[in-house]
Amino acid sequence: MRSGLEGPEPIGRFIGDVKQRKPLANTRFFYLATPYSKYPGGIEAAFQMACEQAGLCIAAGVHVYCPIAHMHPIAVRCGMDPLDHKIWLPADEPMMHAASGLIIVMAAGWEESVGVKHETDLFTRAGKPIAYMRMGMPPIGFLHA
């Protein structure tokens, strides 16, 4: 009998040694920056827009990580302040460092966005490529940069 302190019962068994597994064929991804607090219509509208733009990129074969699409529902679900840069900028930095480049969605408010500025500065300092995306137009040519 389990005491409950060990965590949940495992659902399945892991077969094989991780070291023996082949790496994923394409691990390259781009960081998708979108405005959030400055977006007209508020942060929920910004979240919806970010998800739509990320979806368009993914459908076009441009692999992206979008912090707003990922972090907004976490903030809402966990009762965290979605506008607190002291929480979210450091939480996003590991993904910025891992990304191959930055794609900035030129949605309303992007030029005033504190987050987009922070992301742009970090990618510029790292010497990583930066592309600008018009709404609804994934930068497919960026794949070959």
Description of each model-found segment:
Residues 1-145:
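Conserved catalytic or regulatory cores that recognize and/or transform ribose-phosphate-containing ligands
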